Design a protein with these regions (language model features):
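Conserved catalytic breakage-reunion loop centered on the nucleophilic residue
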Residues: 1-189
Length: 189
């Protein structure tokens, strides 16, 4: 199940519910993002390149195709169509859909009364391999994941924080980050 829209680079198969087909019009965007990443670019650098080269965002493409997100895009300046965020790029780089796998059970509701979503640990996810055509090879995907992991834990002084990857937000389940404000040198989490 992929929600209302297929991930960027794919379209929903009109003949088979829940199946994805490669979108020949947008697959190049995914290939470009992974190519930049495998050649050492980080998410911020990739985002900057996508904006500079005026690559359309997934939301803009959905607006153009289906008329969705009209409240965001209708009557807005053209730059909004290319306003990529680092979070979007990071999400794409971590998405196993692009190697042909479906991953389910990533999040759940806090309770039947509270519909707020929380991320589940990776060990509880369900992976179904080879459910659709891959856009990215598993080798390229693995290389990018290793680069992300190596880049994430490095500090400017070359050390790794002692609680790196261990301290999680109680509300959403994401890892907390520690840093120092560059202007006043105050630490923050």
């Amino acid at each position: 199940h992929y929600g209302a829209y297929a991930p960027l680079g794919y379209v929903k198969d009109p003949d088979k519910k829940g199946h994805l087909l490669v979108d020949s019009e947008t697959r190049w965007i995914i290939e470009k993002i992974f190519d930049l990443a495998v050649h050492g670019r980080g998410a911020a650098s990739i985002t900057r390149i996508l904006v500079e080269e005026k690559v359309p965002t997934p939301g803009w493409l959905n607006f153009q195709r289906y008329g969705t997100f009209a409240n965001i895009y209708a009557g807005t300046p053209e730059e909004k169509a290319y306003a990529w965020t680092i979070a979007q790029v990071k999400s794409i780089l971590k998405e196993e859909t692009y190697i042909g796998h479906s991953v389910h059970n990533k999040q759940t509701n806090i309770s039947f009364k509270n519909k707020k979503k929380v991320r589940k640990p990776k060990e509880e996810w369900y992976r179904v391999e080879n459910t659709h055509e891959a856009i990215i090879s598993e080798d390229v995907f693995r290389q990018v994941q290793e680069q992300i992991c190596n880049r994430r834990r490095r500090q400017k002084n070359g050390t790794t924080q002692i609680f790196s990857g261990l301290v999680k937000c109680a509300d959403c389940g994401w890892s907390l980050a520690y840093g120092v404000n560059s202007q006043n040198k105050n630490p923050y989490a």
